[in-house]
Amino acid sequence: MKRTRFFSRTVLVLTLHWTASSSCYSAETDAAAIKTEITKRHEEAVKRLQDWVGQVSIAAENRGYPEGAEYMAKLARDAGFQQATVINTDGKPGVFATLDASALKTVGLYFMYDVKQFDPAEWSSPPTEARIVDKPPLGKVMIGRGAVNQKGPEAAFLAALHAIRGAGKKMPVNLVMVAEGEEEIGSPHIPQLVRRPEVLAALKKCVGVFMPFAAQDLDGVVTVNLGSKGVIELELVSSGEKWGRGPAKDIHSSLKAMVDSPAWHLVKALNTLVSDDGNVIMIDNYPKPLPLTAEQKAMIEKVSKTRSEALAKKQFSVQHWINDLPWDQANERLESQPTVNIEGLVGGYTGPGGKTILPHRAVAKIDMRLVPDMKAADALAALKAHLAKRGFGDIEVNMTGGYDPTATSKDSALIQAQLATYKKFGIDALLWPRNAGSYPGYVFTGEPLKLAAGHFGLGHGSGAHAPDEYYIIESTNPKIQGFDGATMSFVEYLYELAK
């Protein structure tokens, strides 16, 4: 990505000192006042989220920087953070914040303020407008890019801070926040943020790190993830110039009879990476995944019996799982298997009608999901060696971001507090070996911090990375929390972590 000095990355250091009328507090005595404050502040909290959705930061397009970080800092200040210091890094702007409540325990937060690209033509309403619409049978939802991934849950968490302070209550824990603006391109520079001495020092005091999340499915069921898959994002580029065969510029397609095609060269290379059905990785010497344990298989079996297969297929707009696997086996495959996925293919003419050319260049955008104990560096090295061995060494492999998978013990204080909090809402949460998606939790779970890390939050949304992404604001399903309920879940979680 082309960069200019104007878009130099910065990190905003924020500190917050909270005061309260009393040094004594408990979830039981404080809850009613805080809940009343949440209801009172509903409209302003929703408006805050709408405004944030309107502030777009897309790393892949170099759009919305450094404004996105500045806006993130403003949100923090509005929630009570008092001091900010800008720190230059090599990455896009990040935010490091600390909240000192003079509490006995400290909890880490991971935020992202960037969002995925979007095509407005594919949406039912403008993706940056954050329009609130009726969506039967869910209730009122907010439609917008970032609504559920991840600004909605993060805004609900910030609303919890506003409500605690507005109710005149003392924060039960200290907080350390790390927010980045490159999550959607594989978080290539988050180590530079987290491994700064002052950030490491703050995080080392934490009992764990969590990311605000909308954990409920369409039935209101909650699964607690004990980790996440890792990921590598990259481009495979085939060009006539680099190959030494085919044209160095687009030429008339009639010449295909005597000139090699870089596009076909790329297709043939892609074909060697997977089985004929595209579902089994065939890369030579590729890292092997760690098999699921008996305990993990039992978790998957329990979840498969509880969560609706029909609702899952409806949500994902699919009719069949790979190889027509039954629900439990499809879930087991989801949790245990690495993947090689084609995100997009770009080459030649893609406009209306036809254009008889032989393209000089073709690109495949790829993501590769990793499970424990696979390492991103090993997977990338195996891919490069495989292509070279198979006669495709000329194809460029440009990694744009990525990181290792994460794992957290179910017995950690972070996870046990989640289970206890969900129980307060009448939910017996299910344990899930790992989120099939990815986030850069490895910087917290790996050396030198080795902290528990995960996701938490009630509420529901869907459509991340897709058109009409949504987040429930007012739920008509008593099993699913709306925005205010999600906000209260964060309040209860902080009090639970303080125990």
Where are these regions (language model features)?
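Bacterial N-terminal signal peptides that target proteins for export
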Residues: 1-11
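Acidic/His- and Gly-rich active-site-bordering loop/insert found
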Residues: 27-147, 166-173, 366
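Bacterial N-terminal signal peptides
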Residues: 9-23
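Acidic/histidine-rich catalytic neighborhood of metal-dependent amide-processing enzymes
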Residues: 141, 146-227, 498
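Metal-dependent peptidase/peptidase-like ectodomains
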Residues: 198-201, 206-263, 271, 376-422
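An extended, acidic, His-containing surface patch that forms the Zn2+-binding/catalytic region
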Residues: 187, 218-219, 282-361, 369-382, ...
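Polar, glycine-rich mid-to-C-terminal structural blocks
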Residues: 234-310
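Short, solvent-exposed loop/turn segments at the edges of secondary structure
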Residues: 125, 172, 205, 227-233, ...
